[in-house]
Amino acid sequence: MPENLSSALETFKQQRNAAEAHYLKANRVSVFFREYTAAVETLLAALWAEHFQNSALCLMAVGGFGRGEPYPCSDVDLAVVSPAPLSDGIQEQIARFIQTLWDCKLMPSVKSGSVDELCESVRDDITGDTAFLEARFLFGNRQTADELAEKMNVQRNVAAFIEAKLVEMEHRHAKSQGSGAVLEPNIKSCPGGLRDIHTLLWIAKAQGLAANLPDLLKQRILTRAEAGMLSHGYRRLAHIRIRLHLNAKRAEDRLLFDLQPQVAESMGYQDENRRRQSEELMRVFYRAVKTVKQLGGILTPMLRSRVSSTPMRVTLRIDDDYIQVNNQIAARHTDIFFRRPEHIFKIVEIMQQRNDITALEPQTLRAWWGATRKINRSFYQNSENRRRFAGFFRSGNGLTQTLRFLNLYGVLGRYLPAWEKIVGLLQHDLFHIYPVDDHILAVVRNVRRLALDMHSHELPYASALMQSFEKQDILYLAAFFHDIAKGRGGDHAVQGIADARQFAADHFLTEEESDLLAWLVENHLLMSAVAQKEDIQDPGVLDAFCKRVQTHERLSALYLLTISDIRGTNPKLWNAWRASLLESLFHAAGRCLAGNDGNPHALFGRRRQEAADLLTRAAVPEKQQKKLWNALGSAYFARHQSREILWHAANLVHDFEPPIVRSRILPQSDSFQVMVFMPNGPRLFARLCRIFSRHGFDILAARAFITEHDYILDTFIVQIPSQHAPEDYPDIQSALEAELNSFIHGHTVAETQSCNRRISRRSRYMPIAPSITITPEEDYPDRYSVEITAVNRPFLLADMAEVFFAHNVSLRYAKISTLDERVEDSFTVFSPDLKNPKIQSSLKQALLEQLA
């Protein structure tokens, strides 16, 4: 590199470092962009002079660099423009120039060609056209730059350009769905991200308006409040993106788990707990994108309407205050929301009641939103406002859209201060993937879908139950309040009771409705915990659950709320196995509350009789049946539910020569049920678990049963790896059965091996602290309950079973609850040695070492 260019490169590095240092000290986005742009342009000036002295070409900044928004590691977008087609010599010259840019580590993205060629290249390329919309002259022949800009502007179909950008935005938002996009959002392309702000400005500039917020304010396109809020949201997002690049040392626009604490700390969020640091950063991020989405809902249709051809305007009178314009509702006088604040809820009430109205007319929305910022205690105390708000839930029609609309524009948080505390609050617990407010609204949506016949095919039984449930509005309210006390410290279910009861008292609920609402909020985790962690075949467990529930109404409401809560937490959590657990508990509790199955011996006898009836219908001799029941023992009927007993019996009675392996594909699921019947042996349960883990199966549930004659009957529910299609399941089943048969007949071993499956970034950088509790069971000497919470990983259950074996602890029952990347496992174990505190402590320590 010539000496003069080496000197220019050194100057650039110094200026770039100075720009970063000034930014880190002053924390001003605009100053960083200005100084970094100047540093790049100084270097480009030297390079241009070296390669194109006295040339007819010109150099233009386009895209983000043209906009004057260069991020630390982003591409430098440029265009080399010629008044005439490029000769071979000029093309070689441009290639050398681009190589020099790479040598200087500028990360160039360069378009080159004649004015006509470049115009033609973007005719059907919306991305290229957008880049040139922000073009600005740098060096060379200015006349060529002006000619290009003029031809581009003449060529551009403004209405088509705007529609294309809006379609592009819709596609971008659609790609930003799913847990990864929520937990590790792309700060540029996510809904409400930087690209949405750019889209607004592009739409404005394409129609001849200003391309920056201060000038749009001067042109009265934005109000002062809107310009201020949009500027604030933009600065927040730009700060995060700059810090992302500086910490990652690359053009990383995703808020990855490993980078979140670093970015948070660099932005001044001080906390020794990395998870809390990250949660605070993400809350700032979510609130910023929410502001952008709020303003986008107002400004995008307003800007679009200035140039787009719209269908014929159809206006209908609604009442003295409102008219309907096509599918929108408009206020006759937009100051009505300031003069008569009760109309803040009235217009929403009208929109909820009428299916032919889908939105507020933009100017009405702008005025309405401005008035909502005046919501205060006096507004809350107005009985008309309270009746309307409660009416949103009593009506149910369009409830999800109504609540999401009110949440988007901050009305829920202003009306209910408790709601404001959960907006954007993320939970790094390895199974929640949404901020608390979004999760709650997803749960409301799920409850509401159960009430609609059009969605009955999703969950037919639960839908039928919901559609016959009399107090649907109380269920909607329970969903709305179930997590409202999150983030306060302590038990959110208990703390939420006061919020629910206060709301009920203020919004004209009866005492009976208030009691049901408060009970559901307090106990919303009860059914999930019992079904997933406890042995619901144990009459004592069922009896304790029913004593908490007490009535069929509560049972139905809790069942419906639990289903909706799990489905709204993380799409990965809901599966056929979890559905069957809840349904089994629901039916068992229903029989118990009705006075049936109250006697445990009667229950066990009924289970045995059901199995005997099945075998008799299959023409199995009574002698053969008796042989099976004697081998399994009476305790078998206490530890297994009817469906398992029927399956075991049908498979064992004809081929009762252990060892035996059987499996079946569970209907409408991605899971197998597997049973193994064989003589007991050392570490047998652990070795079986290793076989499943080696095949990539997640163990969803396991029941380890030892007969009176020292045989094991272990039953597993295992989830098939997600990369397999349903048509592959029979082959996978055959392969698994073959390996298990080989193992139980002694032909292969299943020994300890390392874990090859990668642990997710979320588990590595936002882990949860493992916890273990060991509790003696009062009615059963030497029997203990062991509760374990930890990060999920392959071979975890096998490793824990090895620890039990090493400490002379016999595993009698395992209830595995896999919640995405988190496990909450419950074991029933037998060991006289655990009376000794030292041995119990040693067991805990050994388990913790496996969980770490």
From Swiss-Prot:
Give the matching Gene3D superfamilies.
Hypothetical protein af1432, Nucleotidyltransferases domain 2
What are its cofactors?
Answer: Mg(2+)
- Per UniProt, residues of the HD domain are 436-558
Q: Which UniProt keywords apply?
A: Hydrolase, Magnesium, Multifunctional enzyme, Nucleotidyltransferase, Repeat, Transferase
Start and end residues of each stretch annotated as Uridylyltransferase = 1-318
Chain positions covered by the region annotation Uridylyl-removing: 319-672
Locate the ACT domain: which residues?
673-757, 785-852
Which EC number applies? 2.7.7.59, 3.1.4.-
Q: Which InterPro entries match?
A: ACT-like_dom_sf, ACT_dom, HD/PDEase_dom, HD_domain, NT_sf, PII_UdlTrfase/GS_AdlTrfase, UTase/UR
Q: Its catalytic activity? A: [protein-PII]-L-tyrosine + UTP = [protein-PII]-uridylyl-L-tyrosine + diphosphate; [protein-PII]-uridylyl-L-tyrosine + H2O = [protein-PII]-L-tyrosine + UMP + H(+)
PROSITE patterns assigned to the protein according to its UniProt record, in alphabetical order: ACT, HD
Any one of the GO BP annotations: regulation of nitrogen utilization
Query: Would the keyword Transmembrane turn up in this protein's UniProt record?
Result: no
How is activity regulated here?
Answer: Uridylyltransferase (UTase) activity is inhibited by glutamine, while glutamine activates uridylyl-removing (UR) activity.
Q: Which Pfam families match?
A: GlnD_UR_UTase, HD
| Annotated GO MF terms | [protein-PII] uridylyltransferase activity; phosphoric diester hydrolase activity
CDD domains (alphabetical): ACT_ACR-UUR-like_2, ACT_UUR-like_1, HDc, NT_GlnE_GlnD_like
Taxonomy, superkingdom: Bacteria
Its annotated function is as follows: Modifies, by uridylylation and deuridylylation, the PII regulatory proteins (GlnB and homologs), in response to the nitrogen status of the cell that GlnD senses through the glutamine level. Under low glutamine levels, catalyzes the conversion of the PII proteins and UTP to PII-UMP and PPi, while under higher glutamine levels, GlnD hydrolyzes PII-UMP to PII and UMP (deuridylylation). Thus, controls uridylylation state and activity of the PII proteins, and plays an important role in the regulation of nitrogen assimilation and metabolism.
HAMAP family, per this entry?
PII_uridylyl_transf (MF_00277)
Domain comment (free text)? Has four distinct domains: an N-terminal nucleotidyltransferase (NT) domain responsible for UTase activity, a central HD domain that encodes UR activity, and two C-terminal ACT domains that seem to have a role in glutamine sensing.
The UniProt entry, under PANTHER family, shows:
BIFUNCTIONAL URIDYLYLTRANSFERASE/URIDYLYL-REMOVING ENZYME, BIFUNCTIONAL URIDYLYLTRANSFERASE_URIDYLYL-REMOVING ENZYME
Show the NCBIfam families listed in the entry: UTase_glnD (TIGR01693)
Q: Which family does it belong to?
A: Belongs to the GlnD family.
| Protein name stated in the entry | Bifunctional uridylyltransferase/uridylyl-removing enzyme
Q: Which organism is it from?
A: Neisseria gonorrhoeae (strain NCCP11945)
Query: Gene symbol?
Result: glnD
